[in-house]
């Protein structure tokens, strides 16, 4: 007992010395200074006003930056689409086949005039390959129409011969109708959708078993379904494989559009986080333990496509598959990377953007195989097709997919005399256009040197018809003749299948998408081979095309170079704070495709500005830049370099795990015409950097204000316990700012490096009360992540902490000012409308020293509490009751100001209830999404199971405390043990610390902490010695 008392005294002494060092006199002095007119403001007030003004200014700048339009390559360039949709309800799929058959529905899409319609028996006889489309959060089943229509038009149209698949077949698109459910906010809804889709796949496969057309065709019946998911629909597709009703091997190809694979976009519901952990653990184990179940490693492919910077619904970084799906089974790509698309796309447009839907439709038709029961090609062929269709072809890993590796369609040519070969050192880039056509030999032979690590072959052309371009890669070949001596010849192959498409860049070109699919202009074609591939061959034979194939602006540029093609620019963000990084392209010594690598610029949070100046007249094309990152596969093309270029990247992002051994460097691949010297300067674009803070830290708007409000409440209760006076929130906030703001700012800076220490991460993980965070670092050594605080790994980004802190202070003060303004208005209105009699009566009833309640009011509060508890147990989620309690607390604050009395007890009641109202206001955004889900389901006349949200204990303390507040009681400041006071203060401090460290990724748990604190406040407000 003595040791416990000694601990209490020591703890109280430490708190008094180090934490709450301002006293009541300071607060009262500030109150008097605020109320007195003409008095000079104190230094503390000026300090607070400076911090508040700075935060408000930063908030306005961030909002203005967020609302400002994108420029250059980040501008949206999607074209509108036309289609003739029709939807056939699959009426047979009802509650007999799925318990959710009344809530959800299944439709079959038919493109009018293309797909087979109803037959004479008023049924649709399917003969294609099944595809299931899963809409996303609040999505509709009709979103399937764009991709499905493009697939039908491509298959039944004139472009069918362009498909690289002799075994392709028409696709039957089924689409799920989820009544626009909010999948991202409610875990139970996500599980329901996954369960329904598994039942739908079972039913879809049974339809084909009954199809007369399929039996007549002699083709094997389908055993799997291709799945296309938009937004959260892509996550539903992956969750499907983890459920018990999943049919084994029924899914082997998943294509997702803007789906947040790596982390949940919203953390309002703990079930969502648990589902993500279980899903990612399941998929990771399937690829890790391939000996037990080889199906996933040998058959399943997952492709993630994201729209990039224009996606304002969720950060594009969240779509990464890194660390979840091996590179042999899937990858993430950006629409700016995809050939023939080359434009960023917003979250909704990604399902209808004309350029993308054509590419996706072509890919789907090339992935399928009607002769296989799985109806898809083998995994290596699917992945190779996906990489060729969705990646730029300039990635470091792209050479593995070139046909030049294993091309055996040999063309035998006569032996070339050694004197006809031109070495790379003797040769300048070969430029062929209308002006130089007659100066070039008809045949040109380029000798390929060996043991040259920097050897590169590059070709760029604007010719429309590649058949006019005759280029061969040859080996010296000895042909044995049985009737005579050995004959020497050359064995050559054509690289025609390895050409990649890059955006057109002439003087009148503005945007990369101007040469995308369906445009009037055609893109450039290019070849780019490294030394490893070239080492298989001895020389290159190039024959110039016919002169009639050249238009005035057409050109062919060929180069075999041994010059170092990559330049490393060793600048870091700290150096860019002081000056810009300058580098140059020298046309006389550098290859026309030169790469500038920035190994220390890898943060997705920082945007850069690139200023370019170049010289040269009559350039055959305008220089352009391919900005790229190898993981994830993001390439962005920049034209019109005379204007400032904005560099935005998606590499190392907050809260996103990444593999540490991958190269995260930013690469700027400059493609320059001959005789064009270029100077480049790179600096930080602060305005665009602030623009991207909002999309990545939206959840901080709920977490950080709750932290500050809790910290101020801890100080309010400390002063209340020491003086029996409960100060108002705004005044305490000013005192806290003047006393602790420098310390808090320093802490917000130091938290970033501290929480990146491996030992600290493990410690924080072990102390996490929610138990839903599962940092990849703990499971795999090569996976890095920062799951706590702001999710930042770079020391340079430590400034984000103080910036968000200033903005948080401004937001909290404006909320407190709003409540104070409401109270002031209520008092003024009450002053005019209330009579002296009613005031006297209310004083007698409400503000008796012994708090003698009217029995009628007490009875009504008890009945109301019982109804709310019963409603939570039987029907509504506790989040809805929280919203109602917020309104009750607001009513209490209003009533306290309607009957205003200038007494200490009334002041305590008013300040305490106003502060608690502000605390509830900070928790309200956390609970609001679940209320939307409930009201949406209620409107659809269906009650989705809220299993984890019917726990009355999750709201009971708040119910009782709010009702207790309505009875005008306040936690006692006297006759209370010292340890109880420390528990109250410590609880608020813990809530404040939790909201900072865990809050952004665990918002749902903040409600439970507030609930526990409310229970404790209720306990301290009880007078256990009283009969009441």
UniProtKB/Swiss-Prot annotation:
It is a multi-pass membrane protein. GO terms for cellular component: endoplasmic reticulum; endoplasmic reticulum membrane. Keywords: Endoplasmic reticulum, Glycoprotein, Hydrolase, Membrane, Protein transport, Transmembrane, Transmembrane helix, Transport. The active site is at residue 231. One of its GO terms (biological process) is vesicle organization. Its main location: endoplasmic reticulum. Its EC number is 3.1.-.-. Pfam families: PGAP1, PGAP1_2nd, PGAP1_TMD. The chain crosses the membrane at residues 51-71, 699-719, 740-760, 799-819, 867-887, 915-935, 948-968, 979-999, 1002-1022. Belongs to the GPI inositol-deacylase family. This is GPI inositol-deacylase. It comes from Eremothecium gossypii (strain ATCC 10895 / CBS 109.51 / FGSC 9923 / NRRL Y-1056).
């Amino acid at each position: 007992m003595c040791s416990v008392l000694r601990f209490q005294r020591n703890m109280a002494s430490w708190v008094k010395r180090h934490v709450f060092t301002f006293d009541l006199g300071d607060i009262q002095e500030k109150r008097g200074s605020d109320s007195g007119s003409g008095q000079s403001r104190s230094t503390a007030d000026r300090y607070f006003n400076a911090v508040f003004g700075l935060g408000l200014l930063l908030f306005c700048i961030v909002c203005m930056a967020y609302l400002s339009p994108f420029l250059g390559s980040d501008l949206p360039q999607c074209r509108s689409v036309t289609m003739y949709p029709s939807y056939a309800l699959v009426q047979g799929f009802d509650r007999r086949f799925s318990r959710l058959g009344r809530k959800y529905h299944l439709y079959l899409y038919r493109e009018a005039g293309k797909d087979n319609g109803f037959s004479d028996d008023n049924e649709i006889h399917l003969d294609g390959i099944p595809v299931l489309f899963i809409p996303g959060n609040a999505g509709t089943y009709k979103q399937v129409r764009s991709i499905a229509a493009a697939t039908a038009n491509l298959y039944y149209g004139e472009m069918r011969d362009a498909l690289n698949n002799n075994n392709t077949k028409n696709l039957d698109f089924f689409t799920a109708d989820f009544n626009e459910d909010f999948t991202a906010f409610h875990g139970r809804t996500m599980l329901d959708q996954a369960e329904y889709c598994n039942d739908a796949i079972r039913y879809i496969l049974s339809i084909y078993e009954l199809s007369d057309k399929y039996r007549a065709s002699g083709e094997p019946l389908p055993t799997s379904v291709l799945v296309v998911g938009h937004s959260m629909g892509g996550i539903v597709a992956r969750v499907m494989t983890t459920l018990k009703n999943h049919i084994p091997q029924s899914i082997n190809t998943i294509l997702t559009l803007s789906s947040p694979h790596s982390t949940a976009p919203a953390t309002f519901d703990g079930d969502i986080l648990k589902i993500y952990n279980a899903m990612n653990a399941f998929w990771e184990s399937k690829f890790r333990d391939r000996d037990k179940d080889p199906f996933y490693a040998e058959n399943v492919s997952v492709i993630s496509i994201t729209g990039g910077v224009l996606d304002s619904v969720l950060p594009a970084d969240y779509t990464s598959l890194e660390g979840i799906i091996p590179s042999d089974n899937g990858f993430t790509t950006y629409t700016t990377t995809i050939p023939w698309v080359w434009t960023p796309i917003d979250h909704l447009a990604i399902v209808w953007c004309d350029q993308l839907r054509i590419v996706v439709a072509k890919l789907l038709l090339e992935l399928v195989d009607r002769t296989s029961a799985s109806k898809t090609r083998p995994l290596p062929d699917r992945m190779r097709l996906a990489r060729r269709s969705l990646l730029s072809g300039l990635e470091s890993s792209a050479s593995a997919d070139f046909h030049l590796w294993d091309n055996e369609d040999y063309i035998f040519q006569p032996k070339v005399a050694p004197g006809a070969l031109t070495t790379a050192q003797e040769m300048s880039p070969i430029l062929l256009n209308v002006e130089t056509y007659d100066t070039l030999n008809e045949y040109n032979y380029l000798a390929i040197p060996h043991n040259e690590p920097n050897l590169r072959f590059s070709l760029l052309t604007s010719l429309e018809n590649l058949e006019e371009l005759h280029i061969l890669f040859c080996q010296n070949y000895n042909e044995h003749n049985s009737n005579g001596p050995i004959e020497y010849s050359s064995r050559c192959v054509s690289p025609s299948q390895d050409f990649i498409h890059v955006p057109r860049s002439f003087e009148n070109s503005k945007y990369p998408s101007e040469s995308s699919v369906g445009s009037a202009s055609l893109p450039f074609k290019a070849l780019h081979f490294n030394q490893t591939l070239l080492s298989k061959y001895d020389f290159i034979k190039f024959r110039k095309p016919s002169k009639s194939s050249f238009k005035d602006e057409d050109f062919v540029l060929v180069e075999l170079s041994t010059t170092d093609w990559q330049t490393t620019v060793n600048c870091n963000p700290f150096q860019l704070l002081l000056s810009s990084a300058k580098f140059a392209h020298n046309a006389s010594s550098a290859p026309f495709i030169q790469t500038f690598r920035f190994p220390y610029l890898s943060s997705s949070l920082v945007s850069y500005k690139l200023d370019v100046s170049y010289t040269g007249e009559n350039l055959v094309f305008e220089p352009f830049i391919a900005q790229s990152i190898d993981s994830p596969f993001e390439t962005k093309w920049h034209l019109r370099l005379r204007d400032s270029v904005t560099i935005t990247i998606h590499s190392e992002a907050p809260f996103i795990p990444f593999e540490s051994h991958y190269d995260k460097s930013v690469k700027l691949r400059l493609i320059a015409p001959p005789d064009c010297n270029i100077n480049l300067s790179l600096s930080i674009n602060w305005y665009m950097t602030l623009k991207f803070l909002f999309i990545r830290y939206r959840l901080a708007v709920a977490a950080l204000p709750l932290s500050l409000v809790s910290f101020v409440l801890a100080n309010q209760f400390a002063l209340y316990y020491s003086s029996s006076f409960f100060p108002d929130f705004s005044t305490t906030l000013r005192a806290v700012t003047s006393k602790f703001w420098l310390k808090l700012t320093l802490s917000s800076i130091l938290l970033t490096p501290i929480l990146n220490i491996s030992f600290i991460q493990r410690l924080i993980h072990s102390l996490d009360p929610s138990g839903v965070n599962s940092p990849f670092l703990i499971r795999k050594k090569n996976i890095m992540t920062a799951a706590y605080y702001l999710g930042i790994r770079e020391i340079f980004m430590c400034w984000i902490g103080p910036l968000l802190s200033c903005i948080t202070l401004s937001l909290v003060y404006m909320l407190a000012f709003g409540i104070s303004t409401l109270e002031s208005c209520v008092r003024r209105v009450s002053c005019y409308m209330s009579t002296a009699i009613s005031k006297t009566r209310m004083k007698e009833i409400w503000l008796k020293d012994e708090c003698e309640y009217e029995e009628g009011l007490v009875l009504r509060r008890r009945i109301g509490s019982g109804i709310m508890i019963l409603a939570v147990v039987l029907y509504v989620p506790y989040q809805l009751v929280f919203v109602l309690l917020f309104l009750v607390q607001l009513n209490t604050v209003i009533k306290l100001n309607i009957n205003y009395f200038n007494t200490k007890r009334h002041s305590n009641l008013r300040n305490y209830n106003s502060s608690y109202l502000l605390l509830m206001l900070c928790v309200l955004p956390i609970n609001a999404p679940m209320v939307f889900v409930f009201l949406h389901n209620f409107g659809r006349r269906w009650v989705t199971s809220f299993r984890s949200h019917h726990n009355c204990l999750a709201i009971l303390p708040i119910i009782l405390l709010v009702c207790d507040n309505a009875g005008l009681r306040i936690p006692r400041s006297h006759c209370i043990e010292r340890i109880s006071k420390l528990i109250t203060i410590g609880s608020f401090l813990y809530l404040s610390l939790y909201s900072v460290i865990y809050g952004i990724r665990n918002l749902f748990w903040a409600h439970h902490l507030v609930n526990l604190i409310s229970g404790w406040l209720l306990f301290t407000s009880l007078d256990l010695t009283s009969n009441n």
